[in-house]
Amino acid sequence: MKAEIMAIGTEILLGDIVNTNAQFLAKELANLGIGVYHQSVVGDNSERILEAFDNAFKNCDTIITTGGLGPTKDDLSKELAAKYFNMEMCLREELLCDLEDYFKKNNLEMTENNKKQCYFPKEAIILPNPNGTAPGAILEGENNKRIILLPGPPREMEPMFTNHVVPYLSKFTDSVLVSKILRVFGIGESKMDDLVCDLLDNENPTVAPYAKNIDVILRITAKGKDKEEAEKLIAPMEKEIRKRLGDNIYGEGEVTLEEVVGKLLVDKKMTVSTAESCTGGMVASTLINYPGISEVFMEGAVTYSNEAKMKRLGVKKETLEDFGAVSEECAREMAKGIAKNAETRIGISITGIAGPGGGTEEKPVGLVYAGLCIDGITKVKKFNFKADRQKVRTRTMMNVLDWLRRELEKID
């Protein structure tokens, strides 16, 4: 089975609404072993929608649409799908009864145009929608072609697909696709591509790198007659990739870097405090996202001015005068100072120039120093980021968390 995901709606075409439905459907279809060969977005125009159906069926046998099932004149999906398969629309009395009950239970007034949602071809397989007023449907045409019509709102579309479409589609496939995601930080997409380039041509399993935000994900996908067989195909490939990428792999699946670091801190009972300048508390804020971090996170200080660095952290006046606030020496004293004052095993410091102004030839915008004081031993790292203010701050925060992760993994 080959499928196309088609979003119908001018609001998506114009970018007013983000099409999250396509991502959900692509993942779910992959899990069923159904290949998605194309995704498209079509405006609310009869001629263009029919043309899109024509083009899609040149390469696939199944079209899954989202949107266009509402009560207004520009909701055209099911009418045009019926026209494409030469089916006649008729009032489905059972749907009208359900719709009237829905409005009564929710104390809403049912207008005449709402009845439009109860018209489907008599051949249509109806997909119930307990979360809204627009039922979905499956229309089966000749030559094993079908159009699956789903509502646009994700809270309606997702349960409808899971509860009704998945059992229907399962009858047409004898294999499954299973994916394993490895999350990588510390090397860019191009560098990782160099390290695993010979594996990218593999067919089963396939290996594909993707840049996502600041980190990179590596997806290993295998096809098998069942989940167990697919996972057995993935295992040796994963082992080889881990051997090549080492501790640049920080997690699997949907785990975030902050979750990995938070868990390490809590599991190892490593108390921590932060002193930040250009990041303005981003490291502290990100760590606090982890549930249970209160066991180990003691204090976070935003010491933006030189006076604050001296008063709160004990940075020496001579250090600031001789080396400046953005320096290895200042970052070192900041990390030591916050660890001492907060009485924590770890002190984190950040000082830098996020921009857009404030840079010099010697100390350009994007120059950042970070310090880690762990059990009295202090290390400092220098970063140079070529980016705008927000990206400099975000990249600093992520790199410091990754550095902390690697240091924590060395501690028994």
From Swiss-Prot:
Coiled coil: none annotated. It comes from the Bacteria. Signal peptide: none annotated. Pfam families: CinA, CinA_KH, MoCF_biosynth. InterPro entries: CinA, CinA-like_C, CinA_C, CinA_KH, Competence-induced_CinA, MoaB/Mog-like_dom_sf, MoaB/Mog_dom. Belongs to the CinA family. This is Putative competence-damage inducible protein. It comes from Clostridium perfringens (strain SM101 / Type A). The lineage of its organism: Bacteria, Bacillati, Bacillota, Clostridia, Eubacteriales. The gene is cinA.
